[in-house]
Regions:
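Ferredoxin-like alpha/beta domains used as RNA- or RNAP-binding modules
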Residues: 1-55
Length: 55
């Protein structure tokens, strides 16, 4: 992966575009897991790695 676990990233595509998150890992389907803070909650979501950029 081009990101390190715990690295701050920015979502650059989709409905969450512009949000910052923390890179948590990558699965066997090449989807990444990120931790996103929204509305006072932490959400662990999965998305294509091409949707992310370093922050």
């Amino acid at each position: 992966s081009r990101f390190k676990i715990g690295e701050n990233i920015r979502i650059k595509e989709g409905v969450l575009k512009g949000n910052n998150a923390i890179f948590m890992g990558i699965n066997e389907n090449q989807r990444v897991s990120v931790l996103l803070s929204m509305m006072g909650r932490k959400l662990n979501i999965s998305m294509p790695s091409l949707s992310l950029q370093a922050y």
